[in-house]
Amino acid sequence: MRLDRPGPIPLDGLVRIPGGTFRMGSDRHYPEEGPAHGVVVDGFWMEPHLVTNRAFAAFVEATGYRTVAERPLDPDDFPGAPPENLVPGSMVFTMTAGPVDLRHLNQWWTWTPGASWRHPEGPGSSIADRADHPVVHVAYADAEAYAAWAGCSLPTEA
């Protein structure tokens, strides 16, 4: 991947988030979230809007980047997985007829081969009329690559 980029996003396009103190973690839920403790964070600048398909397309055009959803999976990383599960794709939201058991995400998310930021509902769908919609099907690694190209970084917990 080339990191040819337009340079840092100008500060006049960002909003300032003031620093402060917050309570991080929890003592009441999962052990790995504890112990709860106070954390001081410095102020920072943040993009006030979601990244659009248009902006993400500019990044992909400039770098040749392929998202996680566009890359096939390596069978060696998933021994015994059926080959049809190793094709590029992503999970697509499926509207339910009513309330469902939230412990079973397959009731409202469907693995869709070919779904990606370019094809949000899978093959046959496109972003042609959605240039200014928020980009979807972007993994953390994809967001990191976009942020680095834009001269920024992703926010962290603290």
Question: What do the PLM-derived regions correspond to, one by one?
Answer:
Residues 1-158:
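Extended beta-strand/loop cores of jelly-roll/beta-sandwich
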